[in-house]
Amino acid sequence: MRQAGRAALLAALLLLVQLCPGSSQRSPEAAGVQDPSLRWSPGARNQGGGARALLLLLAERFPRRAGPGRLGLGTAGERPRRDNPSLSIDLTFHLLRTLLELARTQSQRERAEQNRIIFDSVGK
């Protein structure tokens, strides 16, 4: 039973590594782990420390968010500046423009239909 649990854990870990982009790069947060028993090494898999290796790999894939003390910022409300605008803002404005265009087109169609009804009733 214990071997089956390890096999399932290993399969889940391999799937996680395949799904995460940049799997060959190590994060600086994970490289800064101070506890030598948690450091990953190629021989760590064979030492029975599978749980430790898994935790370290998860720490590499999903680093903790750096608090204000780690980045050296003065207040907790400050955020580091991003060079590139976020994709969500671009997507939001794109969707907003598209919806406005659709609403404008629908409004023009309704107005044209109302004008056609008026001209038909007047007899022009």
Swiss-Prot record:
Recorded GO CC terms: axon terminus; dendrite; extracellular region; perikaryon; varicosity
Signal peptide coordinates: 1-25
Region (Disordered): 23-46
UniProt GO MF annotations: corticotropin-releasing hormone receptor 1 binding; corticotropin-releasing hormone receptor 2 binding; histone deacetylase inhibitor activity; neuropeptide hormone activity
Keywords: Amidation, Cleavage on pair of basic residues, Hearing, Hormone, Secreted, Signal
Pro-peptide region(s): 26-82
Modified residues (Valine amide): 122
Compartmental location: Secreted
Tissue expression profile of the protein: Keratinocytes in epidermis and the outer and inner root sheaths of hair follicles, epithelium of sebaceous and sweat glands, erector pili muscle, cutaneous blood vessel walls, cutaneous nerves and dermal mononuclear cells. Detected in plasma cells in the lamia propria in colon mucosa (at protein level). Expressed in pituitary and adrenal glands. Detected in plasma cells in the lamia propria in colon mucosa.
GO BP term, pick one: negative regulation of feeding behavior
Domain of life: Eukaryota
Family the entry assigns: Belongs to the sauvagine/corticotropin-releasing factor/urotensin I family.
Note: Positive correlation between increased expression in colonic lamina propria and severity of inflammation in patients with ulcerative colitis.
Complex and partners: Interacts with CRHR1 and CRHR2 (via their N-terminal extracellular domain).
Protein name: Urocortin
Species this chain originates from: Homo sapiens
Lineage of origin: Eukaryota, Metazoa, Chordata, Craniata, Vertebrata
